[in-house]
């Protein structure tokens, strides 16, 4: 079994409101989940206008060569 995690921080300079930021982050979270089947969530900076932190996690039962 293999577990992978990743946390990254985004700078969103075009975001003019928290509503803009939430729209961008939600879209990114949904696309990452659908395309790569990852667990994805906004993990920090919820109330900051132009910053977001995204966390990813994946578990693979069998690692192939």
Placement of each model-derived feature along the sequence:
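N-terminal intrinsically disordered, cationic/polar leader segments
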Residues: 1-14, 27-65
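C-terminal binding/interaction regions
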Residues: 21
